[in-house]
């Protein structure tokens, strides 16, 4: 049975899509503003710009001083933040419903007038903030650069998904104020965004407020389409083997998967869940509980809309265990799933896990606003949130096996290993990437 969350949509004259889902359960309202720009939209030489704007958006606009966006909303009881991803950028806040007008005014002011505050001083300041973020989250954190390494060898640096949202520090260093202004004018306008309002507000009041604060903002020229990232499974095995000071030896594998919004992606995602989601997964039973060669295993799909998605499997070795044995055990289970398939019980378990996770996400105003925005922006269909459980339950065990045999294969993977220097042996891994 599909869910029945109320959803209403309007498009303003300037192209802003507005999605409203009233919920009078608690006096809270969630506001999400999603822009159709992420790292896959960045041309060569401009990597990291979408993420840079995630920071610049809080440095003031025409009518808001630097730092005041956070201060005003927090004074109104809000929690707020932003995130940048391959496919989109998201600005969001949840607050008592009496603060809705404040939240909308602040979002509209930076959509319309952000560039009034983007000067050389602010650019230099936020460029330094991003560099520090990269040092803390990527360079100086154990395994912090694993995804950066994986997407490079899984897609290649010229693919839309071949670089992380943090971007290239060389590109950011070379960026001028004029470059940054041009990127904003190209992507940050009402006709390239979705505004979602969920919570304690009447449908008509929400639409009127959206029009009041955003209706005057002119549309931008049609943004350029993101490059097509359509590509099939990885051919062969691409490796990057790293020796450095890490807490434990680790192996992580990446597989290209079908694009989001397809039954094939749902089936491949369920295959990865059977392998690595939860205590009852095949890899946890074998590597952690039975063979006791791994401290933990994890994995899953990362859905993307640009022609291809990807999924991962990761194992953290126990001290003294041979990482090659961890690798071999993972690959044996990968091949076994593709060859022998899964049981109906396994399918039912991972489908139930997905249903639970989905219901928990939609249970809060903030979570529902996030998913409505996601489906409105990337699929043009916010009502998909009510059908999503049925889509997952429609996948059969045969489809899971077919997807695994096509996409989740031992001979179609990118792989990064991290080993401590003391566990290095000449008989273990070759170093460097083999493309």
Residue ranges and their predicted role:
Residues 38-46:
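Short pre-active-site segment immediately N-terminal to the catalytic Zn-binding motif
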Residues 105-110, 208-214, 326-332:
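Short amphipathic alpha-helices in soluble, non-transmembrane regions
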């Amino acid at each position: 049975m599909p869910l029945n969350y109320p959803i209403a949509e309007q498009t303003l004259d300037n192209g802003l899509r507005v999605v409203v889902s009233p919920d009078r359960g608690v006096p809270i309202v969630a506001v999400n503003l999603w822009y159709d720009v992420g790292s896959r939209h960045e041309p060569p030489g401009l990597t990291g710009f979408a993420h840079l704007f995630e920071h610049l958006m809080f440095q003031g606009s025409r009518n808001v001083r630097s730092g005041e966006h956070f201060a005003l909303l927090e004074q109104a009881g809000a929690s707020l933040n932003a995130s940048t991803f391959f496919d989109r950028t998201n600005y969001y806040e949840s607050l008592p419903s009496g603060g809705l007008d404040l939240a909308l005014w602040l979002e509209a002011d930076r959509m319309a007038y952000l560039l009034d505050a983007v000067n050389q001083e602010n650019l230099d300041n936020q460029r330094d903030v991003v560099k520090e973020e990269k040092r803390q989250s990527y360079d100086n954190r154990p395994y912090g650069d694993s995804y950066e390494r994986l997407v490079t060898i899984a897609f290649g640096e010229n693919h839309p998904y071949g670089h992380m949202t943090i971007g290239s520090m060389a590109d950011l260093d070379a960026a001028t104020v004029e470059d940054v202004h041009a990127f904003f004018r190209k992507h940050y306008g009402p006709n390239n965004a979705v505004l979602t309002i969920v919570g304690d507000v009447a449908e008509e009041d929400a639409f009127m407020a959206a029009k009041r604060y955003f209706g005057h903002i002119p549309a931008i020229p049609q943004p350029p389409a993101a490059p097509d990232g359509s590509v099939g499974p990885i051919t062969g095995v691409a490796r990057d083997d790293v020796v450095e000071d890490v807490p434990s030896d680790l192996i992580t594998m990446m597989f290209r998967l079908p694009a989001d919004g397809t039954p094939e992606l749902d089936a491949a995602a369920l295959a990865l869940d059977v392998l690595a989601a939860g205590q009852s997964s095949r890899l946890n039973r074998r590597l952690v509980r039975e063979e006791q060669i791994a401290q933990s295993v994890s994995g899953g799909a990362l859905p993307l809309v640009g022609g291809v998605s990807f999924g991962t499997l990761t194992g953290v070795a126990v001290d003294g265990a041979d990482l090659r044995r961890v690798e071999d055990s993972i690959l044996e289970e990968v091949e076994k799933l593709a060859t022998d398939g899964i049981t109906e019980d396994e399918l039912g378990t991972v489908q139930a896990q997905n249903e639970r996770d989905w219901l928990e996400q939609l249970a809060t105003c903030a979570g529902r606003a996030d998913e409505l925005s996601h489906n409105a922006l990337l699929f043009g269909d916010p009502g998909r949130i009510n059908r999503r459980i049925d889509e997952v339950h429609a996948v059969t065990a045969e489809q899971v096996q077919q997807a695994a045999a096509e996409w989740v294969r031992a001979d179609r993977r990118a792989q990064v290993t991290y080993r401590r220097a003391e566990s290095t042996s000449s008989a273990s891994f070759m170093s460097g990437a083999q493309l």
